[in-house]
């Protein structure tokens, strides 16, 4: 695998799609963007060179923020002249533990760093200062296995925080594992509440623009073979639903160890089974008007890509896919691919963020 380091792309309609690209031993200028396959009329370009970008967020003033899983840093990105390239890349915080998740509330930046939720107040006014973020909550598990987090504030004002399973497949005595928690950041004390259970490792979610339901990706377990189980796209219509893990994978695959322990537990099947081992991360419903009308309110999915499929079968994922609502139901197809060449990946999409002009940013860690 070629190691670049981190980038953010921008995708738009000619139409520009932007890509956040990592910093590494190879210059972003030499990225083989010509190998990426996009629909006719779309263009993709590098928006910023960033170290290991994961979740993206945007402030009220339009500053882009990028968390990281491995670099331990939070970056701020500023496109000062509006040319779709961030000339200024700032380190806003560093020496953090897997600060992958970011969320904006008002003018405050919230950061998920393993067991902690951190906060930088008045972020737009403090961009040129290296911050020591305030720890506002310290109580999530400190297990590093699936410990990185994607976070966001919901329509209800609560902070949604997934807590991944501390394993490939297990049934923990601690019910906070394999769940999505909510946190009222205005409360004292802050006490997490379980929103959804049976969620192995969700690293991306959003709310449907019409129903307000939470849609989230979930990464399927490993070591059941190259072609199963599927990864999942789920819809949570209310608090308290259970989405199957570790008992059921996808719609109907009983786990060989835990399937018989399901009992009378009622589980919610995925709204869409994704490919096996594609590792779906960030998602975004398209709400802009830059793309053609048939893209509106359709769901873009960043597929980070497989890591342990057999060489003879080949890797899967490493693309931006799109889930479309059609007269036949929800259908799933490729929007951008080409990061995987000859079974070797030169990029791994991680998150998607729509900008005010209707273009998309795609982080590649």
What do the PLM-derived regions correspond to, one by one?
Residues 115-154, 162-165, 196:
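Asp-box/WD-like beta-propeller blade repeats and closely related beta-sheet repeat scaffolds
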Residues 82-88, 125-127:
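Acidic, glycine-anchored loop motifs typical of Ca2+
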Residues 46-51, 90-95, 136-143, 194-198, ...:
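Surface loop/turn motifs at the tips and blade-to-blade linkers of beta-strand repeat domains
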Residues 55-56, 63-66, 108-111, 159-161, ...:
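Hydrophobic beta-strand segments that make up the repeating blades of beta-propeller
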Residues 29-38, 148, 165-169, 175-189, ...:
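Beta-propeller domain segments
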Residues 45-70, 279-285, 301-302:
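Beta-strand-rich domains and repeat architectures in extracellular enzymes and scaffolds
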């Amino acid at each position: 695998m070629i190691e670049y380091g981190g980038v953010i792309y921008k995708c738009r309609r000619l139409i520009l799609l932007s890509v956040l690209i990592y910093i590494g031993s190879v210059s972003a200028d030499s990225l083989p963007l010509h190998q990426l396959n996009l629909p006719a009329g779309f263009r993709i370009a590098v928006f910023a060179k960033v170290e290991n970008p994961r979740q993206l967020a945007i402030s009220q003033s339009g500053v882009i923020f990028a968390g990281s899983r491995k670099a331990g840093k939070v970056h701020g990105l500023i496109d000062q002249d509006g040319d779709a390239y961030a000339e200024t890349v700032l380190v806003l915080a560093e020496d953090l533990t897997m600060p992958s998740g970011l969320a904006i509330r008002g003018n405050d930046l919230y950061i998920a760093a393993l067991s902690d939720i951190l906060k930088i107040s008045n972020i737009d006014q403090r961009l040129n200062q290296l911050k020591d973020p305030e720890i506002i909550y310290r109580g999530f598990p400190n297990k590093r296995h699936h410990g990185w987090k994607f976070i966001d504030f919901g329509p209800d004002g609560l902070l949604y925080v997934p807590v991944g399973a501390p394993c490939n497949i297990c049934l923990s005595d601690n019910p906070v594992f394999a769940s999505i928690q909510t946190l009222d950041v205005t409360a004292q004390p802050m006490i997490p509440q379980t929103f959804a259970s049976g969620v192995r490792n969700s690293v991306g979610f959003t709310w449907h623009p019409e129903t307000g339901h939470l849609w989230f990706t979930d990464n399927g377990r490993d070591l059941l073979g190259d072609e199963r189980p599927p990864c999942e796209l789920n819809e949570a219509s209310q608090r308290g639903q259970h989405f199957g893990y570790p008992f059921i994978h996808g719609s109907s695959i009983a786990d060989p160890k835990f399937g018989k322990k399901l009992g009378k537990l009622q589980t919610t099947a995925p709204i869409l089974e994704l490919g096996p081992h594609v590792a779906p991360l960030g998602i975004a419903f398209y709400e802009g008007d830059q793309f053609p009308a048939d893209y509106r309110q359709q769901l873009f999915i960043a597929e980070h890509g497989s890591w342990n499929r057999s060489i003879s079968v080949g890797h899967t994922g490493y693309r931006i896919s799109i889930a479309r609502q059609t007269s036949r139901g929800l259908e799933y197809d490729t929007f951008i691919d080409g990061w995987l060449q000859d079974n070797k990946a030169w990029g791994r999409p991680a998150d998607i963020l729509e900008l005010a002009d209707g273009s998309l940013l795609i982080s590649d860690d």
